[in-house]
């Protein structure tokens, strides 16, 4: 990975910052994207730090223009709405906002990166989904639907489309389960930890670095050069059922 130019979106967040650090440890030239967390992104020591609202088409286009040619894109940025709301009480405004900040933002990021791949003839895109998109998540149907679309129809379409313009380009995804991060800190109390780890053989919540390591593995042409259209789940073996009382 040494010398590869990598864009990490959402680099001011827990998983995003871990991804940026992991790529830098591999000798990559990292472009760290942020939306609101400029200071946190700036503290990473990345080669370039750029701000953009990924739900706004013009800002995403500017981001890729300023980032320049890229070898890898880790599309990490996303927002998990912390309040549990069942579908019958879910406001349309929240539904649309959650889809914009997760699905639309990932689509615009993927489109920008793959347009560049069409020019350079290569590229590796790693999108970050969620176990919510694999198993569902009661109280967060909006988030689960957005993440399911990313690691389902979007992933499988992109891996087939990109090779028309860049024959060795690859698209994969990582699905984290419960992970310690600023986004989940307020929700992981002792009772929640006990409940969610009952679905995991490893019986622990992930650290951002656990997720970042798998993002780097999928991004690497050496380690994953013949891997595309795949999902790596980083969730301690989580299943959609209880494994212990």
Segments from the language model and where they lie:
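Short C-terminal tail/terminal secondary-structure segment
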Residues: 84, 223, 228-245
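Conserved glycine-rich cofactor-binding loop
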Residues: 12-13
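Residue(s) in the substrate-gating loop at a strand-loop-helix junction
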Residues: 130
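Active-site helix of classical SDR
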Residues: 110, 146-147
């Amino acid at each position: 990975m040494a010398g590869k130019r990598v864009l990490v979106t959402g680099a001011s967040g827990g998983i995003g910052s871990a991804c940026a650090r992991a790529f830098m440890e591999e000798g990559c030239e990292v472009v760290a994207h942020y939306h609101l967390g400029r200071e946190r992104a700036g503290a990473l020591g990345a080669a370039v730090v750029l701000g953009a609202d990924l739900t706004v088409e013009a800002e995403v286009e500017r981001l890729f223009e300023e980032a320049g040619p890229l070898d890898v894109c880790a599309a990490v940025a996303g927002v998990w709405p912390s309040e549990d709301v069942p579908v019958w009480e879910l406001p349309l405004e929240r539904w649309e906002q959650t889809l914009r900040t997760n699905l639309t933002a990932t689509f615009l990021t993927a489109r920008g990166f793959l347009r560049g791949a069409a020019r350079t003839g290569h590229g590796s895109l790693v999108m970050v989904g969620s176990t919510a998109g694999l198993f569902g998540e009661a109280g967060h149907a909006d988030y689960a639907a957005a993440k399911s679309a990313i690691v389902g129809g979007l992933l499988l379409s992109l891996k087939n489309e990109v090779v028309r313009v860049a024959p060795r380009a690859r698209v994969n995804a990582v699905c984290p389960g419960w992970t310690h991060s600023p986004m989940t800190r307020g929700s992981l109390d002792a009772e929640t930890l006990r409940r969610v780890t009952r679905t995991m053989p490893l019986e622990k919540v992930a650290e951002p670095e656990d997720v970042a390591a798998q993002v780097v593995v999928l991004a690497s042409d050496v380690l994953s050069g013949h891997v595309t259209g795949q999902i790596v789940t980083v969730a301690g073996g989580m299943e959609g059922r209880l494994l212990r009382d």
